[in-house]
Amino acid sequence: MEEFPGYLEXDRSRQQPFXYPLLFQEYIYALAHNHNRGLKGSLFYGPSEVXGYDSKSSLALVKRLIIRIYQQNDFLPVVNDSNKXRFVSHHRGNFFYSHFYSXMISEGYAILVEIPFSLRLVSYFEKKEIPKSHNLRSIHSIFPFXXXXXXXXNYVSDILIPHPIHMEILVQILQCRIQDVPFLHFLPFFLHKYHNWNWNSFLITPKKSIYVFSKENKRLFRFLYNSYVSECEFLLVFLRKQSSYLRLTSFGLFLERRHFYVKIKRLQMQHLILIVVCRDYFQGTLWSFKDPFMHYVRCQGKAVLASKGTHLLMKKWKYNFVNLWQYYFNFWYQSYRIHINQLSNYSFYFLGYLSSLLKNSSMVRNQMLENSFLVDTVTNKFETLVPVIFLIGSLSKAQFCTVLGHPISKPIWADLPDSEIIERFGRMCRNLSHYHSGSSKKQGLYRIKYILRLSCARTLARKHKSTVRVFLRRLGSGLLEEFFTEEEQVLSLILPKTIPFTFYGSHKERIWYLDIIRINDLVNHS
């Protein structure tokens, strides 16, 4: 460990003090309640003032919660009395307040824990003189980078970053970043009490507790999980910097607009040194391998590693990840779950697209004096296709069609007004058209839009107790067609502004937009 003082210094520099007393301030829970209500925007990327406190009943509910927290004696554990040490009550009569307790406190904790990291981020941008608007990068910006950089790669590896089995692993990662001791003690205490409450109330097994926690406390879980992912990538960059004689050519950080901790990180390395972390935590021999060209792209929990090197190099790179997770983060991960494939014969699924490398061969006749000969030129093209099977599976789970892709009605929407039903289906179609506008072939997307269009017609016919044919004959088929082909003009990588393809269009050009700030919901569930 003496050989790597830079790592310890980096960890100390990342430590941030926290204001533990803020947990007992009323406005923190009001702010958390506002975020729970689904207000758009970010706490640190929008206006500094907090707007939207227009629901007096909701504020009264938050006020009642704060009063109960202040008055309740069993909020903190009582020494030598485990029966009274209850964070939330799990009696049936207090179920609403119990759930409300855990949601508000976890949201309030997540808001407080984000503040030092956001201040550090803002200071970084001010030091680099980078305007905020330049950092609002689109998810689609990854694909032009992959089209230019992955065309010369030979192998690609899909990496699904694993979730730690126990929440304590995520808590331990924060210990090198937090100086406030009460915060360090409060988080494990809250997680332990939350786990016991769920286990006693719903008979949830310990293996499923992290899943339940991630579903009900999304903001806090995202922060903890992204801290863990950031630690993985920080170690990767740290090991790279130890080899100073090889230069890191490009390193970019992209932050998502809505939540700064839901980040997209792009790491492009040229002449990278791969270092295998030994079992005795850096005290053993470090052996390295020179890679002439390596690309690493990650979004949320999935990463893609592409290389121009050999299969042996990719295999060593795979074990580098496995050893990092097993011996540094202390949880088991099987190496066979990371697949290494030859890019020319493989299509990988990433960010809602099926991407592959297509080889185009062209014959050129050259004439030199009296001799003529043919030259075969092979060029690589990065192909992006709409994953029709995955999207149909997502539509089937959402009850828009059958497993085979036959449209069905949406019964739970049948009670809504006709305009609301058409608006919901139309919004889904527009979002899919917008998100998958970079596809090389649009036939699959036309099929998805047809399923949604006919599902909308079946839902309206079900509501009016009629058949689809009679309903469309009475209102006219042009009603749905005109609505579903209506598109908004948005800024794209092809200037000037262009309008996406229509329902019956035959456009083949790929359009990457600059306003895609999150993954489409259907893509996330596929």
From Swiss-Prot:
Protein's UniProt keywords contain Zinc: no
Matches recorded under Pfam families: Intron_maturas2 (PF01348), MatK_N (PF01824)
UniProt xrefs under InterPro entries: Domain_X (IPR024937), Maturase_MatK (IPR002866), Maturase_MatK_N (IPR024942)
Gene Ontology terms: biological process: mRNA processing; RNA splicing; tRNA processing
Compartments (UniProt record): Plastid, Chloroplast
An MF annotation (GO) of this entry: RNA binding
HAMAP family (alphabetical): MatK (MF_01390)
Protein name: Maturase K
Organism lineage: Eukaryota, Viridiplantae, Streptophyta, Embryophyta, Tracheophyta
Gene: matK
